[in-house]
Amino acid sequence: MAVFKKKKTSLTSLFLGCYKAKNASKYEGGEKAVMKIRTCPAFKRLSLSDISDPSSPMSVMDDLSHSFTSQKLRLFTLSELRVITHNFSRSNMLGEGGFGPVYKGFIDDKVKPGIEAQPVAVKALDLHGHQGHREWLAEILFLGQLSNKHLVKLIGFCCEEEQRVLVYEYMPRGSLENQLFRRNSLAMAWGIRMKIALGAAKGLAFLHEAEKPVIYRDFKTSNILLDSDYNAKLSDFGLAKDGPEGEHTHVTTRVMGTQGYAAPEYIMTGHLTTMNDVYSFGVVLLELITGKRSMDNTRTRREQSLVEWARPMLRDQRKLERIIDPRLANQHKTEAAQVAASLAYKCLSQHPKYRPTMCEVVKVLESIQEVDIRKHDGNNNKEGKKFVDINKFRHHRKGKRRVNIAYSDSLVYKESKAKQNDGI
């Protein structure tokens, strides 16, 4: 875990006049609803660097209690979470990721007075895993302040002794990973796959276009959650980073992420930009098109890396038909598949300056959806909306010289519990 220096400046000065503070007394056993924001046009989103001592739980709790947000985050006690999850019963377990196990639970006003009755997902930190207090705090700082229909909603959190827990809205269809790769599951229709791709793209575009940009850094199928209507929402912001501001072109950081999804220039140099997320999106789009995992050691050596094997075939119509998920049969429209494949090809460019922005990605996917809807309704009017041509977007970003730096502490993070080929 990173070591942080304690800052002397209080957060109070950042929010003077913007918040109505409540009494910040003892936290054990009692609810501490985090502050509501008053009308404050100069509101600045908090970052990890704004916390006076990120490594100290009590300092963090004190800073949070004086700071945000309009979303009314709830502080849960460990005893309340035991009630919600039936004592963290294995029968309630939904899955397990890099942060730790996730349980299904239910909350109502008997547990928390005034709270809406609803199912929830409770994610508890694995004290022996790869992640810890910093990732828990990052999750609160990002999802506690950012609100969008394509980001999973954070309801509250728990911080008692070494325990770190997060409480989210429950997503009935689970992760895209499970829906796409689980054995014996029904094949997802082409239209559903493109709907999910569009929703996830809108989530990334929202982060990248924020006044203070956010780089998600760990975009993959297991972090895309689906509601009952297959609306996609991004989850797990433990590895997210604030993007470069002003004249800065990138953020330099230790390489983190998941094998098979991180952009090559990020792995090579540790230079992080929004283009890393665009590359990761291209990997997921390729998985949606082919129905294959990004990395699979059970495949032939030539095909183990999906990107290396499939990308060269994305621009050849005859070869493209060979790599499209055979479970789709004739569901997909040839032209729509070609547009999606061309988009994936662009996102997976080795040079970041040739990748589209996420806003451009959204425009292409929206055109696919609109044309598909029109054809489904029997409206084949040639004067109607056409596919957006990704090749016509101008490369307005300045090219950057690639610097080959081998970071001695670089690490491509792998999930603590190997998920590949285990039937999940």
UniProtKB/Swiss-Prot annotation:
Domain of life: Eukaryota
Catalytic reaction list: L-seryl-[protein] + ATP = O-phospho-L-seryl-[protein] + ADP + H(+); L-threonyl-[protein] + ATP = O-phospho-L-threonyl-[protein] + ADP + H(+)
Subcellular location: Cell membrane
Record has NADP as a keyword: no
Key word Kinase present: yes
InterPro entries, per database record: Kinase-like_dom_sf, Plant_Ser_Thr_Prot_Kinase, Prot_kinase_dom, Ser-Thr/Tyr_kinase_cat_dom, Ser/Thr_kinase_AS
Residue ranges crossing the lipid bilayer per the database entry: none
One GO term (biological process): defense response
Protein purpose: May play a role in the signal transduction pathway of osmotic stress. May be involved in plant defense signaling.
Family: Belongs to the protein kinase superfamily. Ser/Thr protein kinase family.
Identification of the protein by name: Probable serine/threonine-protein kinase PBL12
Native organism taxonomy: Eukaryota, Viridiplantae, Streptophyta, Embryophyta, Tracheophyta
